[in-house]
C-alpha cells in the first residue's frame, strides 16, 4: 500500500481525538492541502475547493510545485478562479491516499497500516476535516466554497454542519444524495476490487496487488464519467490496427476498448484500493434528507439558527423523498449559490444540480442553476473549460 503525495503538499493536524459521524475516532490524523494567491489582511478573500474521489490537493501549479494540476485551466492568475484576487485553498479528502490520513496511513496506536481497521468514513467526516483546515488558517468565513463531484456532496455537508462558514457556494456536478444508479455502479466497482484474490481482505502489497480488480473498477468508472454521445463522436466503431489488436479471440478489438484499457492501467497503481473502497462507500451513504426529522438540529451536530423551524418531510416509511432532500437543502443558510451540471451526466444527473439550486433557494439563498450542453458527461467540469469556465468566472465576479 502506498500514499501518493505531490511535492509541496502542506499538512494540518486535526484535533485528536477526531470524532467521526458513524462512531469511529481518529488519533493524530492530518489533512493535506495546498494554497494559491495571498490572503487579504481582513481574510475576506478565501476560496475553498473540495474535490472528487480521486484528485489530490494539487489543483494547479504554484510556487511549491510548478507541475500542472488537475484543474490547471480553472485556477490561477486571470483564470476563472483568479488567484490574483482570491486566496485559494484545495483540501485533499480525509480517507484519501494523497496526503490526508486514510486506510493507507499508519495507525499510530499499532504502528501498522490501518487497512480495513480504518473507521467507517462519511462525507460528513470529510467536510468536518476541511472545515478544521479553514479555521486553522484563521478564516472566519470563506468568500466562496466550491465543490465538484463528490466534493459537491462534501460542500453541502460542510455548509449544513458549519453554518456561516461561507458567503457563497458553487456546486459543480454534485448532489445532495446518492441515487440508486450511482450506488449500483459504485457497488460493482467495490465488488470488482474485493473479488480480486490479491485484495486479500485488504492485506495486499506492491508485489501482490489487486490490479485486475482496480482495472475493472476504473473502467466501470470511466464509462459513467463520460457520455454515449462522446463515445460515439470520439470512437464510433473504429477498430484497432492489426498490429494493435490482440491475438486473443476475445481481446481488444475496438478503439474504445483500447482507450478504457489504457486509462485503467494508468490509474491502478496511483490510487490505493482500500482508500477507493472507503471513499466510494462514503458517497453511497450521503443523504441530506437524514437531517430532516423530529430531532432538533443541535442533536445532529448542527448549530444552525432557524434550522428547526423547517418542517419534517420524511415519508411514512422513513425513506427519503424529493421533498425530504429539498427540506434538507433548505436548512443550509448561504447568501448566493450556483449549481452547474452537464446535461449528458449519467452519474450525477443534471436534475440533481437543479434540485440543489431549488433547495438552497427555499432556504432564502439567491441560487441559480445552469445546465450546460456539454457532450462529456460527468467529467465535463475537468475538460470542458470553454463551458464551465465562464459560468464560474461570472459568479465569482459578483462575490
Curated annotation (Swiss-Prot):
Residues 52-55 are annotated as: Important for substrate specificity. It holds the Pfam family Abhydrolase_1. Belongs to the AB hydrolase superfamily. MetX family. Keywords: Acyltransferase, Amino-acid biosynthesis, Cysteine biosynthesis, Cytoplasm, Transferase. GO terms for biological process: cysteine biosynthetic process from serine; homoserine metabolic process; methionine biosynthetic process. The record marks 186 as: Important for acyl-CoA specificity. Pathway: Amino-acid biosynthesis; L-cysteine biosynthesis; L-cysteine from L-serine: step 1/2. Gene3D superfamilies: alpha/beta hydrolase. The active site is at residues 149, 345, 378. GO terms for cellular component: cytoplasm. This is Serine O-succinyltransferase. Its EC number is 2.3.1.-. GO terms for molecular function: homoserine O-acetyltransferase activity; L-serine O-succinyltransferase activity. It is found in: Cytoplasm.
Amino acid at each position: 500500500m502506498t500514499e501518493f503525495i505531490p511535492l509541496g503538499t502542506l499538512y494540518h493536524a486535526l484535533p485528536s481525538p477526531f470524532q467521526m459521524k458513524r462512531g469511529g475516532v481518529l488519533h493524530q490524523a492530518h489533512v493535506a492541502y495546498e494554497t494559491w494567491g495571498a490572503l487579504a489582511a481582513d481574510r475576506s478573500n478565501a476560496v475553498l475547493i473540495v474535490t472528487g474521489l480521486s484528485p489530490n490537493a494539487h489543483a494547479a501549479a504554484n510556487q511549491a510545485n510548478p507541475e500542472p494540476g488537475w484543474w490547471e485551466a480553472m485556477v490561477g492568475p486571470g483564470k476563472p478562479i483568479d488567484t490574483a484576487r482570491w486566496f485559494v485553498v484545495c483540501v485533499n479528502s480525509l480517507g484519501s491516499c494523497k496526503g490526508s490520513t486514510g486506510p493507507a496511513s499508519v495507525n499510530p496506536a499499532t504502528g501498522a497500516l490501518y487497512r480495513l481497521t480504518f473507521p467507517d468514513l462519511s462525507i460528513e467526516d470529510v467536510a468536518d476535516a476541511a472545515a478544521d483546515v479553514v479555521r486553522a488558517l484563521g478564516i472566519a468565513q470563506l468568500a466562496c466554497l466550491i465543490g465538484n463531484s463528490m466534493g459537491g456532496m462534501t460542500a453541502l455537508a460542510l455548509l449544513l454542519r458549519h453554518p456561516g462558514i461561507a458567503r457563497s457556494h458553487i456546486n459543480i456536478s454534485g448532489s445532495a444524495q446518492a441515487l440508486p444508479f450511482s450506488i449500483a455502479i459504485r457497488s460493482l466497482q467495490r465488488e470488482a476490487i474485493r473479488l480480486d484474490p490479491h485484495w486479500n481482505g485488504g492485506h495486499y502489497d506492491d508485489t501482490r496487488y489487486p490490479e485486475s480488480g482496480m482495472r475493472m473498477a476504473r473502467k466501470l468508472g470511466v464509462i459513467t464519467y463520460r457520455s454515449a454521445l462522446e463515445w460515439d463522436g470520439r470512437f464510433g466503431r473504429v477498430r484497432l490496427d492489426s498490429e494493435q489488436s490482440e491475438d486473443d479471440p476475445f481481446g481488444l478489438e475496438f478503439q474504445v476498448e483500447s482507450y478504457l484499457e489504457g486509462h485503467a492501467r494508468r490509474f491502478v497503481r496511483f490510487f490505493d484500493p482500500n482508500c477507493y473502497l472507503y471513499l466510494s462507500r462514503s458517497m453511497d451513504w450521503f443523504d441530506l434528507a437524514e437531517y430532516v426529522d423530529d430531532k432538533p438540529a443541535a442533536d445532529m451536530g448542527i448549530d444552525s439558527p432557524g434550522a428547526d423551524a423547517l418542517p419534517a418531510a420524511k415519508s411514512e416509511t422513513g425513506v427519503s423523498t424529493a421533498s425530504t432532500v429539498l427540506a434538507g437543502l433548505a436548512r443550509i443558510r448561504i447568501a448566493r449559490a450556483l449549481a452547474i451540471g452537464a446535461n449528458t451526466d449519467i452519474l450525477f444527473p443534471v436534475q440533481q444540480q437543479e434540485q440543489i439550486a431549488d433547495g438552497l433557494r427555499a432556504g432564502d439563498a439567491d441560487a441559480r442553476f445552469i445546465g450546460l450542453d456539454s457532450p462529456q458527461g460527468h467529467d465535463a467540469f475537468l475538460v470542458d473549460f470553454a463551458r464551465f469556465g465562464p459560468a464560474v468566472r461570472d459568479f465569482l465576479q459578483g462575490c
